[in-house]
Amino acid sequence: MTLLDGKALSAKIKEELKEKNQFLKSKGIESCLAVILVGDNPASQTYVKSKAKACEECGIKSLVYHLNENTTQNELLALINTLNHDDSVHGILVQLPLPDHICKDLILESIISSKDVDGFHPINVGYLNLGLESGFLPCTPLGVMKLLKAYEIDLEGKDAVIIGASNIVGRPMATMLLNAGATVSVCHIKTKDLSLYTRQADLIIVAAGCVNLLRSDMVKEGVIVVDVGINRLESGKIVGDVDFEEVSKKSSYITPVPGGVGPMTIAMLLENTVKSAKNRLN
């Protein structure tokens, strides 16, 4: 069994981004990511801090806008509009979840597609579905693909199962795997018999937010397992959606949690931001 070490790969990517940023600075461009946080969700605050720290590590300027929980939708839209028209800002990220009185879809669509480094804008989703690399790809699925590529895992002809059908991970992940030549099944909350799919799979990607959802009796020998889940137990320990101890015994490759997909997600956010800055140069 080989661990898919996202922490090590993300560190390597950050070093490469440092060099790219030094080149851009020599041309008068400083990569800049604007992050908007609405409210005081503790998990969101932690994520925003980690993103700001990661930006600093590879020479990206980060602007954090921490807005009050009672910020109106129009006030948030006005800030995004200002950032859309600010040429010194190359990426805009709105930290989810948003308060209930704000429409998430409307907010995400208001970010200009050329600064949508999360890859959620309908235009960027369209590029992905057409198999084009013109736009930005969602960070978590992109991070998974880079991780698999780094370990020279050939996806062509693989039977792949994705557990979870969210717009953030499951759906774009399915499209990327399809574009890479895999045969893809997407399972979700209404799937009748999950094991029927997982037992036949060469590759399983789990993104459901459910502890121990994937157990060893549900997988075949030699399976490749990517665990996107992040769950905090009462003890404070962070675990994924996979029973790691048992499933790893049957896996050829598996991601740890933490240290697998999480660091890659942030690395891809940074990479998309630098890509946007480079587009400005071109």
Swiss-Prot record:
Key words of the record: Amino-acid biosynthesis, Histidine biosynthesis, Hydrolase, Methionine biosynthesis, Multifunctional enzyme, NADP, One-carbon metabolism, Oxidoreductase, Purine biosynthesis
Top-rank lineage group of the source organism: Bacteria
CDD domains linked: NAD_bind_m-THF_DH_Cyclohyd
Record-level Gene Ontology MF annotations: methenyltetrahydrofolate cyclohydrolase activity; methylenetetrahydrofolate dehydrogenase (NADP+) activity
Enzyme Commission (EC) number: 1.5.1.5, 3.5.4.9
Any one GO cellular component localisation term in the record: cytosol
Pathway stated in the Swiss-Prot or TrEMBL entry: One-carbon metabolism; tetrahydrofolate interconversion
Cysteine disulfide links: none
GO BP annotations, alphabetical order: L-histidine biosynthetic process; methionine biosynthetic process; purine nucleotide biosynthetic process; tetrahydrofolate interconversion
Entry-linked InterPro entries: Aminoacid_DH-like_N_sf, NAD(P)-bd_dom_sf, THF_DH/CycHdrlase, THF_DH/CycHdrlase_cat_dom, THF_DH/CycHdrlase_CS, THF_DH/CycHdrlase_NAD-bd_dom
Residues the entry annotates as binding NADP(+): 164-166, 189, 230
Reactions it catalyzes: (6R)-5,10-methylene-5,6,7,8-tetrahydrofolate + NADP(+) = (6R)-5,10-methenyltetrahydrofolate + NADPH; (6R)-5,10-methenyltetrahydrofolate + H2O = (6R)-10-formyltetrahydrofolate + H(+)
One Pfam family in the UniProt entry: THF_DHG_CYH_C
Assembly and oligomerization: Homodimer.
Function: Catalyzes the oxidation of 5,10-methylenetetrahydrofolate to 5,10-methenyltetrahydrofolate and then the hydrolysis of 5,10-methenyltetrahydrofolate to 10-formyltetrahydrofolate.
Family classification: Belongs to the tetrahydrofolate dehydrogenase/cyclohydrolase family.
Name used for this protein in its record: Bifunctional protein FolD
